[in-house]
A protein has these predicted regions:
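Peripheral, non-transmembrane regulatory/ligand-interaction domains of membrane transport proteins
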Residues: 1-171
Length: 171
């Protein structure tokens, strides 16, 4: 899925076509969508699709005419009917006329921007947008770590008494 946004007077608008200063958000894009964006912006297809590989490591690379930023962001996952915490790659491609984000799944971090919850968010101020995304990611990491630590303390208190196999597995 490819969605195009642009802020005008601090309001995030959905666009039907690509314009200067826009944000192109790609969530689990098809190969055709990847090809179209790669061709339109003269980006190597591998640079866009690298964010879809869960094993891809974080990096920043300066390419000819664009910058690729790949970071792991936190995302919730349900396994065995329990909420778990994991990370997935988020690709951010910076071009002079647009910013492109690529992710395998729809994440709370990107949705925070789509819902226009960030103060002074502008798709035209690309570096600020990147900093805001990284800050939001760090904020979610911290919130998740607090929840994990709280759960760890609860389990440790239970383990002090009778220890069962499920307590050890949870820990």
């Amino acid at each position: 899925m490819v969605e195009i946004y642009r802020t005008d007077q601090q309001v995030l608008n959905t666009l039907t076509d690509i314009q200067d200063g826009c944000w192109i958000n790609m969530v689990d894009p098809t190969s055709k969508e990847l090809e179209q964006i790669a061709e339109r912006f003269e980006i190597e297809p591998e640079d866009i699709s690298s964010a879809l590989d869960e094993e891809e490591s974080s990096r920043i690379s300066l390419e000819d005419g664009y910058t690729v930023i790949l970071v792991d962001i936190p995302t919730p996952e349900v396994r065995h009917e329990k909420k778990m915490y994991t990370t997935i790659p988020l690709g951010i491609i910076l071009k002079s006329e647009a910013i492109i984000t690529v992710c395998k799944v729809d994440t709370p971090i990107i949705n925070y921007f789509v819902r226009n919850k960030v103060k002074e968010f502008s798709t035209k101020k690309k570096m600020r947008f990147i900093y805001q995304m990284l800050f939001r990611s760090a904020f979610v990491y911290q919130a998740n770590l607090r929840l994990i630590d709280k759960k760890r303390i609860e389990i440790e208190e239970r383990v002090d008494g009778d220890t069962s196999d499920t307590d050890l597995i949870e820990l």
